[in-house]
Amino acid sequence: MATYAVGDLQGCLEPLQCLLEQVAFDPARDRLWLVGDLVNRGPQSLETLRYLYSIRDSLVCVLGNHDLHLLAVWRNVERLKKSDTLREILEAPDCEELLQWLRQQKLMHYDEARNIAMVHAGIAPQWSLKKAQKCAAEVEEALRDDNLFDPFLDGMYGNDPAKWDSDLKGVTRLRVITNYFTRMRFCTSDGKLDLKSKEGLDTAPPGYAPWFSHKERKTRDLKIIFGHWAALEGHCNEPGIFALDSGCVWGGAMTLLNVDSGVRLTCDCDAQGRTAALSPDPLPAPAKR
């Protein structure tokens, strides 16, 4: 049995299928981990969701900001944007079945045997593993509880508060937790977020740094797989941290990681998120701990 992790799909099914074919992925035997942003911007959001649902017993997903946005639009608490490619899902006869499944997915996955976590954007540097798990569970409960679902989605959007405080309550508390897990790139060492900067590692505002680079980060003994940050092109040069968003939907590539060996495979994509070429990753696998 092999376990593979793949970066942001964003509705690009063709490159995913190309990668899985190359590693002879067998859902009866292997496991597939996905870092979130399963849908949106790409040309095959509905087909992607249907495929993932068909292999759900072999799948571990964490939710990304685009997945949460889809749920919010579905529940009529947010409107479609011009750049969204979600309408086909919302009009599909199996929309209810697919999105009821989607709302059951995790915000954070932790594999104790491997001591490795998977999230969409990152883990707040001031959180321990135990604290991160507890915070993720709070949002997961809100997503799965019919009485909490719509109020959470309605209050989910926004950049404030910019920093975690254990005294936060209600939807404000859930919003900052969600922003850490699904939107974070740069922050201060005590977790104050900058949610505007989206470029490479050297573009941090003064006083800020990539979330994973803070020396005080409490999860330094934990290996972490994440996506979300396309400008990193799948590499962050941090031991034990595996960046997998390589910008497929923007004409970059989709990246697959063998979770145990660290070997990567990339599928180059065109500007429409379709397969262009397949190649082994030219960079060495990230260092293991």
UniProtKB/Swiss-Prot annotation:
It comes from the Bacteria. Its EC number is 3.6.1.41. Signal peptide: none annotated. Keywords: Hydrolase. GO terms for molecular function: bis(5'-nucleosyl)-tetraphosphatase (symmetrical) activity. Pfam families: Metallophos. It catalyses: P(1),P(4)-bis(5'-adenosyl) tetraphosphate + H2O = 2 ADP + 2 H(+). The keyword Nuclease does not apply. HAMAP family: ApaH (MF_00199). Belongs to the Ap4A hydrolase family. Hydrolyzes diadenosine 5',5'''-P1,P4-tetraphosphate to yield ADP. NCBIfam families: apaH (TIGR00668), PRK00166.1 (NF001204). This is Bis(5'-nucleosyl)-tetraphosphatase, symmetrical. The gene is apaH.
